[in-house]
Regions:
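N-terminal regulatory/sensing modules of transcriptional regulators
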Residues: 1-144
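CheY-like receiver
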Residues: 127-167
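Recognition helix of helix-turn-helix DNA-binding domains
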Residues: 177-212
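Basic, Lys/Arg-enriched C-terminal extension of HTH/homeodomain DNA-binding domains
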Residues: 199-246
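Generic alpha-helical secondary-structure signal
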Residues: 49, 119, 186, 197, ...
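Short alpha-helical "packing" element that flanks the helix-turn-helix/winged-helix DNA-binding module
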Residues: 167-174
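DNA-binding alpha-helical recognition surfaces that contact promoter or target DNA
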Residues: 118, 172, 196, 203, ...
Length: 246
């Protein structure tokens, strides 16, 4: 059994699998030497456990974009928490979520144990050296502001790539809400050509066949409800077709 780097506090591990997610997405954690561990299924249980276990590491089953507001709450309340989101596949919007939250990392469920151990070491060291105030201030955005920030990061990153001219135009129109038929009319081309351009972009970014391009690169803006649990559910529903990735 491999242990974390000497000098770090004993590791407490939270395995979080929210209702609707597949626990088979968890990686093999047998190589981690932990002081204590627990499996949880509700956001309320996770937040309460982090209150009682400061400095714990979380491994969550599923893509982070489907639980965006939950992670915002986690990092706002417990800014030094390390979170690994484990899944069979990730979408471009998930990469943007990883880039926004300093201590959130994407891992594939088939990741070798030795790699997970090393990533845990580096992440835990980074968390204890980070200013909590910096992370707290970054996570005070409102729900619409947070969703727009993630979507903007995704769009800027994807459009900065060397895309074919037709692919760039198709991407822009689809993300603006145009249907494939309307996109074809605006570009003066056929629906099949639009479909082919979309498939090329999906292949470029490893987007599964069953996931529409707009759902892979954009989180839909949820209706904001003052109930703490309602926005989490709305963003989870608006992040698109997570079931296709399990």
């Amino acid at each position: 059994m491999q242990t974390l780097t000497r000098g770090l506090p004993p590791l407490r591990l939270i395995m979080f699998c929210q209702s609707g997610e597949n626990p088979a997405q968890f990686p093999d954690t047998g190589g981690l030497c932990v002081e204590d561990s627990v499996r949880l299924r509700t956001p309320e249980g996770l937040l309460d456990r982090l209150r009682r276990w400061p400095g714990a590491m979380v491994i969550s089953a599923g893509r982070p974009s489907t639980q965006l507001l939950l992670w915002q709450q986690v990092f706002q309340r417990y800014p030094r928490t390390v979170v690994f989101c484990s899944s069979n596949a990730f979408l471009p919007v998930d990469v943007s979520v990883e880039g926004y939250f300093r201590h959130l990392r994407l891992i594939k469920c088939a990741m070798p144990v030795r790699v997970l151990v090393r990533m845990a070491e580096l992440a835990m060291w980074s968390s204890v050296q980070t200013s909590p105030y910096e992370e707290e201030m970054k996570n005070v955005l409102s729900v619409p502001e947070l969703v727009m920030e993630i979507n903007s990061r995704t769009l800027v990153r994807l459009l900065s790539e060397r895309l074919p001219k037709q692919g760039r135009r198709v991407l822009g129109l689809l993300l603006s809400g145009c249907s494939p038929e309307m996109t074809a009319r605006m570009l003066g081309t056929g629906v099949r050509q639009v479909w082919l351009a979309e498939q090329t972009l999906k292949q470029r970014w490893d987007i599964p066949a069953g996931v529409p391009l707009p759902d892979a690169v954009r989180i839909r803006m949820p209706d904001v409800n003052p109930d703490i649990n309602q926005p989490i559910a709305l963003v989870k529903a608006g992040a698109g077709n997570a079931s296709d990735l399990r």
